[in-house]
Amino acid sequence: MNLHFEELTGTDGARIGIATLDAEKSLNALSLPMINAMRDKLDAWAKEPQIVCVMLRGNGIKAFCAGGEVRSLVDACRAHPGEVPTLAANFFAAEYRLDFSLHTYPKPLICWGHGYVLGGGMGLLQGANIRIVTPSSRLAMPEISIGLYPDVGASWFLSRLPGKLGLFLGLTGAHINGRDAIDLDLADRFLLDEQQQELIEGLLQLNWQEQTPMQLNSLLKALQQKAVAQMPEAQWLPRREQIDELLDVSDVRCAWKAILTLLDHTDMLLNRAARNLIEGSPLTAHLVWEQIKRARHMSLAQVFEMEYTLSLNCCRHPEFSEGVRA
């Protein structure tokens, strides 16, 4: 299986559990067996007293996790047009249960979000209580390009971004860097890509029997101080006022038209975002508008319930299969 688990013992006998996604050729895309295995192991670690901290990471330099392994889902949907294949129902149920369990995990849960953190990878990162990004981090919910919609709890975290930024990112699938992630509260710490082993060694040196939160925070703060000089420039907060004005509209059709005015913009970041939308799925755009609006008033559990229903309905519609093919 493309997922490995290990336990490292610290100086005081406490153990750190590490789960490593290891499907480098697919940028560590999540398959159903990987999701189930991770859920089982995290549940076991949560109940094991000697496990004091858990880390999620991805193998390879390109990505932590670039999403779910959707090809098999699409094949199943094509084989059962207009229906919800059993594989799809099982996949989304397992993925969302895993994501929800991360949000409520009872121990320190560190996610190392280097490289591409897309779709399902964002679901893992946002569920952790210590979300780390690096200079190589590129975060996005790019479902506008495949006829799905931003799921894995994105209804929750996008709807809670400042102003209209969540709506904009959902409609365009635009990438954000490590600085953006910190600024928008989509990450907690910025470390260098090469500091992962230093972090692990630091965790193993902590005294997990007393003042754990203070010690852990001090470790992370010290590591971040070494990295902060390499933090990239912010991309999206400086453009927030413009985006808020652009998307101060009454419906998704007006939002679509407003974003398309950016196609002639000299700001290439905005121009590229508009191109993502025009080349994307109109159905996804309608779903994004509605999910962002509804999720503001939902609990996290309600959000995942809504997303499960949405995902099953997307499987019934040919837009998803066609979007992945294209």
List where the protein language model places each region.
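Conserved CoA-thioester-binding segment of acyl-CoA-metabolizing enzymes
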Residues: 1-57
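Hydrophobic/aromatic residues within transmembrane alpha-helices
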Residues: 56, 69, 124-125, 180-181, ...
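Glycine- (often His-adjacent) and acidic-residue-rich active-site loop
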Residues: 58-97, 147
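Glycine-rich beta-to-alpha active-site loop
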Residues: 102-146, 168-169, 173-174, 178
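Gly/Pro- and small hydrophobic-enriched strand-loop and loop-to-helix capping segments
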Residues: 128-150, 185-200
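Contiguous mid-protein beta-loop-alpha structural module that forms a pocket-lining wall or clamp
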Residues: 153-214
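Amphipathic alpha-helical blocks and their helix-capping loop/short-beta junctions
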Residues: 192-277
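Long, low-complexity C-terminal extensions of enzymes
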Residues: 255-272, 277-326
